Amino acid sequence: ILGGFIMIKKIFFLAFILLCFNIFSNADYSTSNDEANVSASDQNFNNLDIGSVFLIIIVGAILFEYFGSNSSSNENYNVFIIMDNRATKNIKNISKKLEENQIENLYTQGYVIHVTLYLTKYEKNSLYKIKETVEKIANQTKSFDMEFYKLEKTERKTLAVYAKNNQNIQQLADEITVNLTKYRKKDIETPEWVRYFPEKEKLFNLYGSPDVFINFNPHVTLLTQENSSKINSFILNYNFTPFKTKAISIGIGKANNLGQIKEIIYSQSLIS
């Protein structure tokens, strides 16, 4: 539906451009009929006075802003937990083993190690409000412990290390979601995979994300696309050791279509 709406906008804008082109082409054509009609054609062209030309330019600019814009004007922002060096060390070790098994992973590709709190697409020019909200919440939240306890293939056929959920992290995720959902883009299309999970689809329609509130499951994604048999084999043969770490900051990053980020564009420390 969203894609069709964008296409209709583009068609209307193109029609306006063609109309303007036709007007000026007719004026130019009338000047080239023959020398005997020069004065008449000049008169026809002069009918398009300066005011009309300016009006066309102004209307064209407005239409370009409205019809020429689309969903690319909006951004996916991931608001996430940043952990201490213990998390980095353990994820690095797992990623090294993945690489030894010829499995491409996110860490070796330069993606940021993080636990997503809330990921969605926002209205353009919302970043300032997102930063403001994150700063306020971080300044009221104490740093807390996290325990990663299992390595598992996700329902999206990727690989992740899962943390035990607790009151601290669930409350933080809920607070972030409630305070940021007002800035999200409302007409985003539901991802195909979400439609297979009715509860996730309901949450996506309400909050722009399927992984909030009762579906929040804290984890670090290790890879996003890989052969399932390779993942199964790795899990079977890898001796995963649970580890503890501490949530120390809340970060914001521009996310790709898979929710992954390569740069932290803003972060605010939690109360130590």
Please provide the spans of the model-predicted regions:
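Short, Lys/Arg-enriched N-terminal segments with co-localized hydrophobic residues
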Residues: 1-6
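Sec-dependent N-terminal signal peptides
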Residues: 11-19
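C-terminal segment of classical bacterial N-terminal signal peptides
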Residues: 21-24
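Cleaved targeting-peptide boundary
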Residues: 26-34
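Juxtamembrane low-complexity tails/linkers enriched in Ser/Thr-Pro and polybasic
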Residues: 34-43
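Membrane-penetrating hydrophobic segments
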Residues: 42-52
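Basic, often amphipathic N-terminal segments
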Residues: 54-145, 151-153, 163-249, 262-272
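Interaction-mediating elements
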Residues: 250-258
